[in-house]
């Protein structure tokens, strides 16, 4: 397991002062931020890619390939999302799988992981996407890695009225 932290100026200062050690500097797909982070450690790109919203066909695959090739990003991360109007677990699972198949077709050989998103009262479509059983089914059936965001899991467990450890 590696310890990744969002890159920022305060983090850079802590690294400079030898106050913290991190394995990876987490950056969005922004070239300026990536260049600023490079002198301070290995850069990991945390992509803004969601499965379940039918938008993977609009991704910039040239940018994705370039960033995977030029950074220390071992996996393409995705987020297990949903869109308004999808209330069926089987429909959402099918959409996740379709989006994943599309990504794999565009990026053959790239290892893909999926991250759990938190559900919120103001984003009701994410309640279904945050279901731990549905997430587990997707991970197992599609040979995906899991990027388990513990803060997202805590938020979802509370809103789903579940024990955090069982989530």
Language-model regions: role of each:
Residues 1-68:
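N-terminal pre-domain/capping segments
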Residues 10, 32, 49-51, 81-83, ...:
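Short, solvent-exposed loop/turn segments at secondary-structure junctions
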Residues 11-13, 132-133, 146, 164:
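A generic local structural motif
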Residues 56-146, 155:
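Active-site acidic/histidine proton-transfer and metal-coordination neighborhood
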Residues 133-134, 155-167:
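A short alpha/beta connector and helix-capping loop motif
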């Amino acid at each position: 397991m590696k310890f990744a932290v969002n890159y920022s100026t305060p983090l850079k200062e802590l690294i400079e002062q030898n106050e913290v050690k991190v394995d990876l500097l987490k950056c969005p797909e922004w070239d300026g931020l990536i260049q600023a982070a490079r002198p301070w450690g290995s850069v990991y790109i945390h992509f803004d890619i969601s499965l379940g919203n039918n938008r993977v066909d609009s991704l910039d695959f040239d940018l994705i390939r370039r960033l995977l090739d030029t950074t220390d990003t071992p996996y393409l991360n995705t987020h297990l999302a949903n869109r308004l109007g999808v209330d069926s677990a089987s429909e959402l699972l099918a959409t996740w799988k379709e989006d994943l198949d599309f990504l794999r077709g565009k990026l053959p050989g790239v290892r893909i992981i999926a991250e759990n998103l938190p559900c919120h009262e103001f984003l009701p479509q994410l309640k279904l996407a945050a279901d731990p059983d549905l997430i587990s089914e997707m991970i197992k059936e599609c040979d995906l890695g899991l990027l388990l965001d513990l803060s997202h899991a805590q938020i979802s467990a509370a809103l789903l009225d579940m024990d955090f450890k069982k989530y």
